[in-house]
Amino acid sequence: MSELRETRLEKANALKEQGQEPYALRFDLTDRMARLQADHADLAKGAERDLKVSVAGRVMTRRVMGKLAFFTLADETGTIQLFLEKATLGDSFAQLSSLVDAGDLIGVHGILRRTDRGELSVKVSKWEMLTKSLQPLPDKWHGLADVEKRYRQRYLDLIVTPQSRETFRRRAMAVSAIRRWLDERDFLEIETPVLQSEAGGAEARPFITHHNTLDLPLYLRIATELHLKRLVVGGFERVYELGRIFRNEGVSTRHNPEFTSVEVYQAYADYNDMMTLTEQLIASVCEQVCGTTRISYQGVEVDLTPSWRRATMHELVQEATGLDFTSFETREAAVEAMRAANLPAPDKADTVGRLLNEAFEHAVEPNLIQPTFVLDYPQEISPLARKHRSKPGLVERFELFIVGRETANAFSELTDPLDQRGRMELQQERRAAGDVEASGVDEDFIQALEVGMPPTGGLGIGIDRLVMLLTDSPSIRDVIAFPLMRPEG
């Protein structure tokens, strides 16, 4: 590699000596590759079109054959062939054929012609070096076979892997579509703090930092929930934020410590309204990004056409395991039944409700392939959700599962400040006992609730997992441009 780099450095110096700057300031484009291909599809084989064009991009392949050369030039939109001949270029042909490598960025001027083999080409009359690449590209036939290198050197992955570029185009389309859908329905996006004095809004371990001037410990937000609810208290009846969330937890194909979510709050709504909103929003985004609501994910057909299945957690667990958790009056009874059913019953699951959630995660969640709203969660694992209107011990909460993954989470929001304080105090006790994911009492949030929050439905959607679905990507790292990686060495 070092020898190749030295050779390319020598070529850069040779360009300078011959009056060519190897790192140009700018280039005047007239066209992009995809537009040229589309607009001139009618050009016949062997014909030329006396239309002057100027294009720029990266040299992906090069073939020099005596007095002729053929390069493939790529820009963001596509590729086009360059037809280069000494008869047209004169002395600059030798310079181009000897000093330009695959990976270099060049600009060319010329006219269009279609080769006898039917390849639309730019017949080059003039060329400029725009950026001399000092590092060779990965092998054009095999690309970046090392998956970890794709994540560490995403810039190379994007250059040589069209599928990766398409993934991030679709991600951008999805984010724009979500914002547009919400904006069109009078939701207002308002930014909330990333640095917070209390880490609340989710059960998660936060990243901790320190403000030197104020001598104050701060947390990177683990959710946007509590500040968005403060905005609802303040009179914003439809509000959302799409942004980054940080959780100091494990890394897997489903988890990255830094990820993106959208949280949405609607006053005078409940979790039933948020279910309707969720399926309409995701179906619309899927239609815009994929052109259909029926897609394939890792070989499995998934139908996102509303309306989606709705079932309670109790119903799904009983259906999968035969266990009726409503019949267990003590934790011990639930543990005995779970062990008889070969289900794990860890000590940390210290209530019947937490054991129900364990049974769900092991026996039900992986099998929820088609979009399914799972309703009515145990109160002890949902400290910010409203008590169920008719089911004691449960809350009005749903999670959306698609292809065995949680994709969204929503509540009828808890607006009773006394109930909320009691729930937060229980969380604080758990934290004092060593639960690093438990939050404390946020006094300012309680005070906001005491001012009065209208009945509200709240929703959070994981953007990365949604994009995984829309791009048929098996790992969250495939849809995050620069995922967190352990330093090499």
Curated annotation (Swiss-Prot):
The keyword RNA-binding does not apply. SUPFAM superfamilies: Class II aaRS and biotin synthetases (SSF55681), Nucleic acid-binding proteins (SSF50249). Mg(2+) 2 binds at E406. It is found in: Cytoplasm. Binds 3 Mg(2+) ions per subunit. Mg(2+) 1 binds at E399, E406. Its cofactor is Mg(2+). GO terms for biological process: lysyl-tRNA aminoacylation. Keywords: Aminoacyl-tRNA synthetase, ATP-binding, Cytoplasm, Ligase, Magnesium, Metal-binding, Nucleotide-binding, Protein biosynthesis. One of its GO terms (molecular function) is tRNA binding. Homodimer. PANTHER family: LYSINE--TRNA LIGASE, CHLOROPLASTIC_MITOCHONDRIAL (PTHR42918:SF15), LYSYL-TRNA SYNTHETASE (PTHR42918). This is Lysine--tRNA ligase. The lineage of its organism: Bacteria, Bacillati, Cyanobacteriota, Cyanophyceae, Synechococcales.
